[in-house]
Amino acid sequence: DIGSRKVVADIDWECEVHHNYQEKNYGCDPSEYMAQKWAFSLSDKCIVLEDDDVPAVSFFGFCKELLDKYEHDTRISMIAGFNNEEITPDITSDYFFATTFSIWGWASWRRVTDQWDEFYTFLDDKENMRQLKNLIHTRRYRKDFIYMCQRHREHGKAYYETIFHASMLFNSGLSIVPTRNMINNLGATADSTHFAG
């Protein structure tokens, strides 16, 4: 919208700015998928924030350090900024590894987004589906995940969140989660579009 474009136009610190304005409103999905694929086509490392994510200033340094440290470690798929426990007790380091993640502020590499299956073709492969069902059961992951992927494919839209999770599951990917939460989500209220309290 016009307000968002004005914010970008008013950036006053030294940096290179790239614009990718859609001529048509596609809605959240597939717009987020399209924007992320575009951003990762320009850079091999990116930090992704949605319009309602408010990061702590330390989030950027946290991402920069870990993007560099784990750049060539293919076990790591993403760096999360959100920790839903706010503070994770009994962990002495600044972060820990997990098999799931939140999309409320994250960073990753092109090598990861290159693995994304925009068309959900894994749904047509019996061996992939057997593995996916086993992973969902073993890791106690969302029981409705396969159903969500099927619905997203039926809608003909690339929903990056399910695509990203499927990619992590199939590639045994890990996320890095900060011991202390670094993201406040202004859209996480009872009357929000994508959030139910």
Regions picked out by a protein language model, each given a short descriptive name:
Residues 1-48, 53-197:
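An acidic/histidine-cluster motif and surrounding catalytic segment
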